[in-house]
UniProtKB/Swiss-Prot annotation:
The lineage of its organism: Archaea, Methanobacteriati, Methanobacteriota, Stenosarchaea group, Methanomicrobia. Pathway: Metabolic intermediate biosynthesis; chorismate biosynthesis; chorismate from D-erythrose 4-phosphate and phosphoenolpyruvate: step 4/7. The active site is at 66 (proton acceptor). It comes from the Archaea. This is Shikimate dehydrogenase (NADP(+)). One of its GO terms (molecular function) is NADP binding. Involved in the biosynthesis of the chorismate, which leads to the biosynthesis of aromatic amino acids. Catalyzes the reversible NADPH linked reduction of 3-dehydroshikimate (DHSA) to yield shikimate (SA). Belongs to the shikimate dehydrogenase family. The gene is aroE. NADP(+) binds at residues 123-127, 146-151, 213, 236. Keywords: Amino-acid biosynthesis, Aromatic amino acid biosynthesis, NADP, Oxidoreductase. It comes from Methanocella arvoryzae (strain DSM 22066 / NBRC 105507 / MRE50). Shikimate binds at residues 15-17, 62, 86, 99, 215.
Length: 269
């Protein structure tokens, strides 16, 4: 009997998760399918419980439901400490967060070392929470820069219980960029074709790495600037595929072909 998985969010029409997971199921000849479901916040609990009672294997949870998912199913330690869940497993009846691990795996697979490295994270929203958590757990020193300095300071204060984290403004950004080994963009800047990147080539050099979580477009203005400076670059599809692979493994106990998932996502864009 086929096992169904899916992603719930609002909106969810542009999700690449079905393409990635179905490609992995096909490659492994597994009798499973993955679909997307648009669910508003007021219906989230009913949708999750309904999927469970219908025999689904599990769900991914995306914007804007990641925090609410913690209140519906018992979170594991990582999801609890991050304050958000993106993966629900109905066999274990647990909520997990694979975003942090996906970001770290993307950096590692891109040849970037993290222990004792300085990292500048742009943005202090939900995506930043998972990324900063993953970084400090790997022994990096993290500076969070945000337009609203108080928000960066608040996130840094919370994450400081897990490692070395500081909050700052976007003022004098060039100096802050030059002081670190890695720059990570967790903001939506770059989704618009005319968006101007916060970090430009004159702030960077070839010893640094730049990671942009934005994946529409894959080649963001920030990554173009980084390449022009000779810096190492990692794009958002790399993280998307790896967080998806972690969810797949939680549900099935099988390590999926990450290369197949990543290629299918790139081909779908």
């Amino acid at each position: 009997m086929m096992t169904i998985y899916g992603v719930v969010g609002y909106p969810v029409e542009h999700s690449l998760s079905p393409v990635m997971h179905n490609a992995a199921f096909k490659a492994l000849d597994m009798d499973c399918a993955y679909h997307k479901f648009e669910v508003k916040g007021e219906h989230l609990k009913d949708a999750i419980l309904g999927a469970r009672y219908l025999g689904f294997g599990g769900l991914n949870v995306t914007i804007p439901h990641k925090e609410a998912a913690l209140r519906i199913m018992e979170p594991d330690r990582t999801a609890l400490e991050i304050g958000a869940a993106n993966t629900l497993d109905f066999k274990q009846m647990r909520a997990f967060n694979t975003d942090a691990a996906g970001a770290i795996d993307a950096l590692r697979d891109g040849g970037v070392e993290l222990e004792n490295k300085g990292v500048l994270v742009l943005g202090a929203g939900g995506a930043a929470r998972a990324v900063v958590y993953g970084l400090v757990k790997e022994g990096a020193t993290v500076t969070i820069a945000n337009r609203t300095t108080a928000k960066a300071a608040d996130l840094a204060a919370y994450m400081r219980s897990f490692g070395s984290v500081f909050g700052t403004s976007l003022d004098s950004l060039g100096e802050k960029v030059r002081a670190v080994d890695i720059v990570i963009n967790t903001t939506p800047i770059g989704m618009g074709w005319e968006d101007k990147p916060l970090v430009t080539r004159d702030m960077l050099d070839r010893s640094q790495a730049v990671f942009d979580l934005v994946y529409r477009p894959v080649e963001t203005p920030l990554l173009r600037e980084a390449r022009a400076a000779g810096a190492k670059t990692i794009d958002g599809i790399s993280m998307l595929a790896r967080q998806g692979a972690k969810s797949f493994e939680i549900w099935t106990g099988v390590k999926p072909p990450v290369d197949v998932m990543e290629r299918s996502a790139r081909d779908a864009l």
